[in-house]
């Protein structure tokens, strides 16, 4: 017989209170497809009130026993959570920050399958930041989401205090401080881009409304599902109570791809490349800015003297990297996208190194570059590490950049016209050209 010691909450015993949160720790409590896995609460223990949870070595589940007058049953002292919650862990948790709630949509998809385990490990928000994961799926994926939750459970992450799965964004987004919106319909063969904008736009309009109603008022939202700039715009327009500044479209993967290509050409390790801006849309019109990027602190054009390659080979390789990868893999980037989501969030929760910046798709109102207001456009940003950011204001734009930035801007304006019915800006009119409106994965 192995013994694991558990601490009970200082307040009323959750084991005695049928409506307590811990009641939900019984696996897969299901209400309207909203299911909840939960660890014991933090900072609510006293060393004097302990429960012993005894585990038979050859039985499947631990059996809680009574101590200090507190009643426990096998059902309430739930499986792995009993085993992982011991006094030593509790000592460590004393210095932990207050738990934060993180929603992830498309949680049964490829990108999430990489991302969720990074979030739970502490790699993103830090080793003293406990988290609750709120996973949004659909009727299609609810079974798979249970599988995801089980894998998270089996990973024994100390910082992962709670896992909820559900299909209703109004429930899943309740009190979330971060929302990572990945779930979106992929473009199928023969599908018009306007149709994709409409189908995915509806998803992001609904999720914007739900965030507006249920999320923490200062929630930070990172839109990954494509076309991510316009989806982010739809989302923010449907969430008027949340600052527009809090919405991001993921262009960090493009930034990382650009750094990699420059490092390769210059023959340096990629950590030597800094100040990399991606301007514009996450599409083949995006502009990887080699004018302002630096290698070993020097302007790229001084280090790489083949300027034709910069203007053509480099630029195109970044714009079309996603498509090439699909050709090789047979599916779009998932692991590197998850890594870039981690990078994007870390850039907001840690101070930007002196003199450097990062790229993210943000709302253009008040931008110093003359880019049309009312778009979500990738630009250079800096953060103090408080979750917020400022636009970098003094980046040089030459004629080459200006022309290409204008093309991406025109593309986003066209996308915006296609979704006017979803942003509350009138009747949609879709005049997207066939060539200039490709996702990176469509080439
Ligand atoms: N911004 C960027 O840099 C990148 C963006 N992407 C984009 O990220 C998104 C997700 O990619 P990935 O995880 O690989 O994709 P997957 O297809 O593996 O999973 C995405 C999830 O989207 C949801 N989904 C699929 N079809 C529909 C639909 N018709 N309606 C609503 N939801 C749907 C599904 O979840 P459920 O059934 O639970 O709703 C699915 O699990 C895609 O839009 C992709 O283009 C990809 C790479 C880079
Ligand atoms: O088009 C896609 O789905 C893939 C994508 O965004 C990328 O690889 O950058």
From Swiss-Prot:
Localization: Plastid, Chloroplast
GO aspect biological process, one term: response to redox state
Enzyme Commission number(s) of this protein: 1.1.1.82
Activity regulation (UniProt): Chloroplast NADP-MDH is activated upon illumination. In order to be enzymatically active, disulfide bridges on the protein must be reduced by thioredoxin which receives electrons from ferredoxin and the electron transport system of photosynthesis.
Highest taxon, organism lineage: Eukaryota
InterPro entries per the UniProt record, alphabetical: Lactate/malate_DH_C, Lactate/malate_DH_N, Lactate_DH/Glyco_Ohase_4_C, Malate_DH_AS, Malate_DH_NADP-dep_pln, Malate_DH_type2, NAD(P)-bd_dom_sf
Keywords of this entry: Chloroplast, Disulfide bond, Isopeptide bond, NADP, Oxidoreductase, Plastid, Transit peptide, Ubl conjugation
Entry GO MF terms: L-malate dehydrogenase (NADP+) activity
Crosslink position(s): Glycyl lysine isopeptide (Lys-Gly) (interchain with G-Cter in ubiquitin): 213
Gene Ontology CC annotations of this record: apoplast; chloroplast; chloroplast envelope; chloroplast stroma; mitochondrion; plastid; thylakoid
Catalysed reactions, semicolon-separated: (S)-malate + NADP(+) = oxaloacetate + NADPH + H(+)
Keyword Transit peptide attached: yes
Inducing or repressing factors: By low temperature and high light.
Transit peptide feature range: 1-52
Top EC class, one word: oxidoreductase
Cysteine pairs bridged by disulfides in the record: 77-82, 418-430
Record site feature (Activation of NADP-MDH), residues: 77, 82
Pfam families: Ldh_1_C, Ldh_1_N
Active site: 282 (proton acceptor)
Ligand binding (NADP(+)): 106-112, 200, 207, 224-226
Residue sites binding substrate per the record: 187, 193, 226, 257
Keyword match Magnesium: no
Disruption phenotype: No visible phenotype under normal growth conditions and high-light conditions in short days.
Family: Belongs to the LDH/MDH superfamily. MDH type 2 family.
Biological function: The chloroplastic, NADP-dependent form is essential for the photosynthesis C4 cycle, which allows plants to circumvent the problem of photorespiration. In C4 plants, NADP-MDH activity acts to convert oxaloacetate to malate in chloroplasts of mesophyll cells for transport to the bundle sheath cells. Plays an essential role in the regulation of catalase activity and the accumulation of a hydrogen peroxide-dependent signal by transmitting the redox state of the chloroplast to other cell compartments.
Protein name in UniProt: Malate dehydrogenase [NADP], chloroplastic
The species this protein was found in: Arabidopsis thaliana
Lineage, uppermost ranks: Eukaryota, Viridiplantae, Streptophyta, Embryophyta, Tracheophyta
């Amino acid at each position: 017989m192995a013994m694991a010691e558990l601490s009970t909450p200082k307040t009323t015993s959750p084991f005695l209170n049928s409506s307590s949160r811990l009641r939900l720790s019984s696996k897969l409590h299901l209400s309207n497809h909203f299911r909840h896995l939960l660890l014991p609460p933090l900072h609510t223990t006293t060393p004097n009130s302990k429960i012993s949870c005894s585990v038979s070595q050859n039985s499947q589940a631990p059996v809680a026993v009574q101590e200090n007058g507190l009643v426990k049953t096998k059902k309430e002292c739930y499986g792995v959570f009993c085993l992982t919650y011991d006094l030593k862990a509790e000592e460590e948790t004393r210095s932990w920050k207050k738990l934060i709630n993180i929603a992830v949509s498309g949680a049964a998809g490829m990108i999430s399958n990489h991302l969720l385990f990074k979030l739970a490990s502490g790699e993103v928000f830090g080793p003293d930041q406990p988290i609750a994961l709120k996973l949004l799926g659909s009727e299609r994926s609810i079974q798979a989401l249970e599988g995801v939750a089980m894998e998270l459970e089996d990973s024994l992450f100390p910082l992962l205090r709670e896992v909820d799965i559900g299909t209703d964004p109004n429930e899943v987004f309740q009190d979330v401080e971060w929302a990572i919106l990945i779930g979106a319909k992929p473009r199928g063969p023969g599908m018009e881009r306007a149709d994709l904008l409409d189908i995915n736009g509806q998803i992001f309009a609904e999720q914007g409304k739900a965030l507006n109603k249920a999320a923490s008022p200062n929630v930070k939202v990172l839109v990954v599902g494509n076309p991510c700039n316009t989806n982010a715009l739809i989302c923010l327009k449907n969430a008027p109570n949340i600052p527009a500044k809090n919405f991001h479209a993921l262009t960090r993967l493009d930034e990382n791809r650009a750094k990699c290509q420059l490092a390769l050409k210059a023959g340096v390790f990629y950590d030597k490349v800094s100040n990399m801006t991606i301007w514009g849309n996450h599409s083949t019109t995006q502009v990887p800015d080699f004018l302002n990027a630096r290698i070993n602190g020097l302007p790229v054009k001084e280090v790489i003297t083949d300027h034709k390659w910069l203007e053509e080979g480099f630029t195109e390789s970044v714009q079309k990297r996603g498509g090439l990868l699909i050709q090789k893999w047979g599916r779009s980037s998932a692991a590197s996208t998850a890594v870039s989501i981690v990078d994007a969030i870390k850039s907001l929760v840690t101070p930007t190194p002196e003199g450097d910046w990062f790229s993210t798709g943000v709302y253009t109102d008040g931008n110093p570059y003359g880019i049309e207001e009312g778009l979500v456009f990738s630009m250079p940003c800096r953060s103090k590490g408080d979750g917020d950011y400022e636009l970098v204001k003094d980046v040089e734009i030459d004629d080459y950049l200006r022309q290409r930035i204008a093309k991406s801007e025109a593309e986003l304006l066209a996308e915006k016209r296609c979704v006017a019915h979803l942003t509350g800006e009138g009747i949609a009119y879709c005049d997207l050209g066939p060539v200039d409106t490709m996702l990176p994965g469509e080439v």
